[in-house]
Amino acid sequence: MTPKQYAYYSLNNLKEYKCLASLYGKESAWNHNAYNASSRAVGIPQGKSIWLLTATPIQQTEWGLRYIKHRYSTPCKAYDHWKAKGWH
């Protein structure tokens, strides 16, 4: 299973998946090795947890979904924040 498939099945909502796909597409291009030197964010969700450095792509996606749920409640709200501020 790919990280995109995992996210789609975890969300079970096409609208929310599209928001997440857009957000992660812009943040990391769904690259589990992505690294932002200026913010030190890593992985698919561009998180600042050192744990993400050794996590699998699926684990990174799961971490990102939990983060979004805790901070924004939905991927669409997280993506709206990203569009307004340039970060999430």
Cite the ranges covered by each PLM segment.
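Peptidoglycan cell-wall recognition and remodeling modules
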Residues: 1-88
